UniProtKB/Swiss-Prot annotation:
Keyword Signal: no
Residue ranges, annotated region (Alpha N-terminal domain (alpha-NTD)): 1-233
Gene Ontology, cellular component aspect: cytoplasm; DNA-directed RNA polymerase complex
Species this protein is from: Chromobacterium violaceum (strain ATCC 12472 / DSM 30191 / JCM 1249 / CCUG 213 / NBRC 12614 / NCIMB 9131 / NCTC 9757 / MK)
Protein name in UniProt: DNA-directed RNA polymerase subunit alpha
Gene behind the chain: rpoA
Any single Pfam family the record assigns to this protein: RNA_pol_A_bac
Amino acid sequence: MQNSASEFLKPRLIDVQPVSATHARVSMEPFERGYAHTLGNSLRRILLSSMPGYAPTEVTIAGVLHEYSALDGVREDVVDILLNLKGVVLKLHGRDSVVLTLKKEGEGAVLASDIELPHDVEVINPEHVICHISSGGKIDMEVKVEKGRGYQPVSARTSHDDNRSIGTIQLDASFSPVRRVSFAVESARVEQRTDLDRLVLDIETNGVIEPEQAVRNAARILMDQLSIFADLQGTAVEEVVEKAPPIDPILLRPVDDLELTVRSANCLKAENIYYIGDLIQRTETELLKTPNLGRKSLNEIKEVLASKGLTLGMKLENWPPAGLEKP
């Protein structure tokens, strides 16, 4: 049978119009009616949420214990310094994290270009202002930069407070290199057909990635996610059968092993309680309803169970186990 996908038009014209080094408009046509909206919305979501980037995640400033401090000789308070640090655009080559050092003395502005960089780390916006130092002031800090995707608040990260040194301030991180994406759908025409669409993507990045390359990466991600649907036969995921947790061997022992009085043992067997696993699932109220089993016998049962680390009223999800018979 002929593949129905071949009956649809595919975009043949792709036009990239650079607005600046970090801003471009990418148009594609023709699309069947409705397909430009479908793909435009999908690409926009992927561009905003799934492009890898780099962001400061931890900061240590000499003489500062928390973000609500102030530094002598520095015009901005620590909160403003941290906000300005988030605006520094960095690109790491061949690594996923790095700790950078920033030291400066003397009056003047502290810029992103003042950060000491190894050979494989690049500052995209070196003129970005981090803070201003007054006469006699200085600043000494370490900044941890990590690779990630999307936006990650401090609470979403796996690092724990007890693993950090005193004075380390964690930052909410916006890793996405894509600052803004919008799309528009316009009318397109091919020969006599006028019911077609043109997709126009307007993309602005922070300079870590070119807009055109961001579109390519987003398209690859979308194709990879959809490829599983292209061949559904023989690709069914095996059902995972959860194994029942093992049963404590003591629960499989008969109640006779508890060495109860004859009266108590007979009362339990009359209620079809043959195993310790049967017994611990009964409550005190249920046992007191048993004929000829009084408070004295109940206390005896509780004491014997307690000596083995067990109590009445326990819940067993996989009881009785398969193949368990009356003793």
